[in-house]
Design a protein with these regions (language model features):
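Mature catalytic domains of secreted/periplasmic carbohydrate-active enzymes
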Residues: 1-215
Length: 215
């Protein structure tokens, strides 16, 4: 959620092509994946802690959430949404056919139409009509959203995404119908780099979890 782009976005200088690396890592990734006959999936963080117009002070997750020096008086969230939508358009336009687009994530008041989610999902579906999208324009890993509630929104996505658990009996909606899901499980105890976290799950456990997901 730090806002650093691994692709060559024209809307920011905070990107891999503007470092000593000097490479569009997303372009290299999709090329390598397709060369092996695999499907292409991209992750996109709805949160951007680097962007000046994303809420800082008082936000539940922002690193500066408790620092009064980062109050939100001059921030323009609509300007941030324009920036974010433009970047989604870039990844849906510049990297060929996408098979999965994984948004992350919604919480508190930042969910659904706070992201202009209907407009965003319509743009994605227009540019990538066959893409599969997760449910995190409306929820996080803590819930399953309108897809499970039996009253799906226009931006509900195609599957739900529980975190750090594999549902033993799958997931059903309120009517008892099975719904598609993807389990998000870390290999250690953190989602990003953590120098002190050496508690990696052993290979047999990871293999077992993969088998459980597809069995």
């Amino acid at each position: 959620h730090d806002g650093f782009c691994l692709f060559d976005s024209k809307y920011t200088d905070f990107k891999s092509t503007n470092t000593k690396c000097g490479r569009d890592l997303v372009a290299e990734y999709v090329e390598a994946v397709r060369a092996e006959g695999l499907k292409v999936g991209l992750y996109f963080s709805l949160l951007d802690w680097f962007h000046d117009d994303f809420p800082h002070y008082g936000d539940r997750n922002h690193p500066m959430r408790n620092n009064p020096a980062y109050k939100n008086d001059d921030r323009d969230f609509d300007r941030y949404l324009t920036y974010m939508h433009n970047q989604v358009r870039e990844i849906c336009t510049n990297y060929g056919k996408l098979d999965v687009l994984w948004f992350d994530f919604s919480y508190d008041t930042l969910r659904g139409e706070a992201w202009k989610a209907t407009e965003l999902i319509n743009m994605v579906r227009n540019l990538q009509p066959d893409v599969i999208i997760d449910n995190r324009l409306e929820v996080s890993g803590e819930g399953y959203g309108s897809l499970a509630a039996g009253n799906p929104t226009p931006y509900h996505g195609d599957f739900v995404s529980p975190e750090q658990m594999i549902p033993p009996n799958g997931i059903q909606d309120v009517n008892g119908n099975d719904i598609a899901w993807e389990s998000c499980v870390t290999m250690n105890n953190h989602w990003g780099y953590c120098a002190n976290d050496h508690f990696f799950k052993p290979a047999p456990m990871l293999i077992k979890k993969l088998v459980e997901c597809v069995s």
